[in-house]
A protein has these predicted regions:
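Aromatic-residue-lined binding/catalytic grooves and analogous aromatic/hydrophobic interfacial grooves
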Residues: 1-417, 423, 434-436, 453, ...
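Extended, hydrophobic alpha-helical segments in both membrane/secreted and soluble proteins
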Residues: 424-435, 444-461
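Acidic/histidine-rich catalytic neighborhood
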Residues: 454, 458-515
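A generic "alpha-helical surface" signal
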Residues: 304-307, 446, 450, 503
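Active-site phosphate/pyrophosphate-handling residues
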Residues: 355, 427, 503
């Protein structure tokens, strides 16, 4: 199956259907009385760059390591809080761009034959219904080649509706938060947004309406009244993250799209999208029962529903991560976020979440969609040099459990099971080697080799001997987001040489050697990397017969914890 379809409009944001071109996104509700599109642009974030590096961490690193080795959990926790937590504690967070309202006045109780769908083959949201004897259609796309969101409206002659553009979260009803102004002209609405916080990006969003020959567009206040049997709404947006003048950037994008009619816009969009989507096909059975997707999820046992889910994941990958000028990878919510205060900042969590986003990329033959991840990684490597040097006295670069649009690599928040974990960047670096294994792109590998090398420099300096002097281990360490009871029954979080750390370090040192071999590099770090890899501890089986999560056979505080980080190497 290649469609998600429903017989009712979305009741909230979670039920709306997503479109995206990697940078611009919208959630389409499909309502008949008042249609709503929740807009996002991937560089609309609260606040600008900030230096949050804990300045006294290195001074207290020996004490922290000693407390961890002595299993003095309270002292380790105290030192981590006062010397290793960043100030301010939070990185920047992602925000909505705005909301488009289209007031049709079609009361739901008088609507018949309602159908709403996301066509995964064409990356198009379609809404159709009958109202008072007339048939109404809307089609929505997010075009990558033309940098535009487009809404096509088909209706009986003389149909009238009102278009508004504002900055409103239906989720929180926070009208006009960080909204500078909205102004309408004869056929366009322009909105300026300052997301808030010091040195934040500024955004410009332009909505333009074009009608069929008999149609009219009338400005009333900051609204546009459209009267036509066919109309096309184009939406463009840029921010100061990519354009010094976002008004000019958005206007240029709009001007380019005006050179294409509806058919050309749709054809260009579909051709581009299908060049990626059509690379693979998964079918697990014949087409399942012809029932709406929400009902199918509840009642169907047809394996084809799994194939649909797989196709949807590929659709989301293509729609949320594309190459371009200062491209950003997909964040915790892809590019779709309705909240001015999203969960976990809707940023880039790198103790598993960002990596998970890209697990389908190479195996689904969508390696190009992974490239924005490496654009961010290059910037992280630059900012991470200070993190490595100031916090740990190490060469190279390091990043902790999260990052943001500005590639912030300092510890984030004040939650011990996640905050003090400087191997987030190392895990991301393994994607370099995996990407090359699929693509065999030597130019890419050459570009990213210095990033990988910097990561290896950090790891070689960060590793210390264990108490026996036999093995090299990490300290401080955690098993991300998990905690334990030690052999005395005391609760702890910080540890030495968690299993996931050792697995990541071993994989990175091995990948570094393989990359150097592919590039013909005789790097001076190679001998040190080989020696360190040979001195890493082996994996250990617990008395219960399980792979240990920690170097010592500790007991999980929460058995069956959602993070199974010690299975990383699998």
């Amino acid at each position: 199956m290649s469609k998600l379809w429903y017989t009712e409009p979305a009741t909230d944001w979670n039920e709306a259907l997503p479109v995206g071109n990697g940078r611009l996104g919208a959630m389409v509700y499909g309502r008949t009385d008042q249609e709503l599109l929740a807009l996002n642009e991937d560089s609309v974030w609260y606040g600008g760059p900030q230096d949050r590096t804990p300045q006294d961490a290195l001074k207290y690193l020996p004490q922290l390591r000693a407390a961890i080795r002595a299993e003095n959990h309270q002292e380790a926790k105290r030192l981590a809080k006062i010397a290793f937590f960043a100030n301010p504690i939070s990185q920047r967070h992602y925000e909505p761009l705005g909301t488009v309202f289209m007031d049709f006045g079609h009361k739901p109780d008088r609507v018949t034959n309602y159908h709403r769908e996301l066509d995964l083959k064409t990356a198009t949201v379609n809404v159709t219904y009958n109202y008072c004897g007339g048939e109404y259609q809307r089609q929505v796309i997010a075009s990558y080649p033309d940098n535009v969101l487009a809404i096509r409206v088909l209706a009986p002659a003389d149909t009238e509706y009102v278009v508004r553009l504002t900055r409103l979260s239906e989720l929180e009803f926070e009208t006009n938060e960080y909204l500078d102004d909205v102004t309408a002209s004869n056929d366009s609405i322009t909105m300026h947004v300052t997301p808030g916080g010091r040195n934040c990006n500024r955004a410009c969003c332009i909505l333009h309406v074009q009608c069929s020959q008999e149609g009219t567009v009338t400005r009333i206040g900051n609204n546009l009244v459209v009267k036509a049997s066919e109309s096309l709404i184009r939406i463009t947006s840029q921010t100061t993250f990519r354009h010094e003048d976002p008004d000019q950037g958005a206007s240029t994008d709009l001007a380019k799209t005006l050179g294409y009619d509806v058919r050309q816009l749709w054809d260009r969009h579909i051709k581009d999208y299908q060049s990626l989507y059509n690379r693979m096909h998964l079918q697990l059975s014949s087409d399942g029962p012809n029932i709406p997707t929400d009902k199918s999820i509840l009642t169907s046992r047809d394996p084809e529903l799994i194939a649909t889910y797989h196709n949807y994941s590929r659709y989301l990958m293509i729609s949320s991560s594309r190459t371009g000028n200062k491209a950003l990878p997909s964040n915790l919510q892809g590019i779709w976020n309705p909240s001015f205060h999203p969960a976990w900042g809707s940023k880039f969590t790198i103790n598993v979440n960002l990596q998970m986003n890209y697990w389908p990329a190479n195996v689904c033959n969508l390696s190009e969609c992974e490239l924005p991840l490496f654009d961010l990684l290059e910037r992280m490597a630059e900012s991470g040099k200070k993190t490595a040097q100031v916090m740990y006295g190490c060469r190279g670069w390091a990043a902790h459990s999260c990052t943001d649009i500005w590639a912030d690599t300092a510890p984030v928040d004040q939650w011990m099971p996640a905050t003090i974990w400087p191997l987030g960047g190392a895990w991301l670096c393994y994607h370099i080697w995996e990407h090359f294994q699929f693509t065999q792109d030597l130019a890419f590998l050459s570009r990213m080799f210095p990033i990988l090398r910097g990561c290896v420099e950090f790891l070689l300096d960060f590793l210390i001997e264990d108490a026996t002097g036999k093995y090299l281990i990490t300290n401080p360490s955690v098993s991300p987001e998990n905690s334990f009871f030690d052999l005395k029954g005391q609760k702890g979080v910080l540890c030495e040489g968690s299993t996931v750390d050792i697995q990541i370090v071993r994989a990175i040192l091995s990948a570094f050697e393989s990359c150097a071999d592919q590039l013909g590099e005789s790097d001076s770090l190679l001998s040190a990397a080989r020696a360190a890899r040979a001195q890493l501890p082996p994996m250990t089986i617990s008395d219960s017969g399980y792979l240990q999560e920690w170097a010592v056979d500790y007991v999980e505080v929460e058995p069956g914890h959602r993070h199974t980080s010690h299975l990383w190497a699998l």
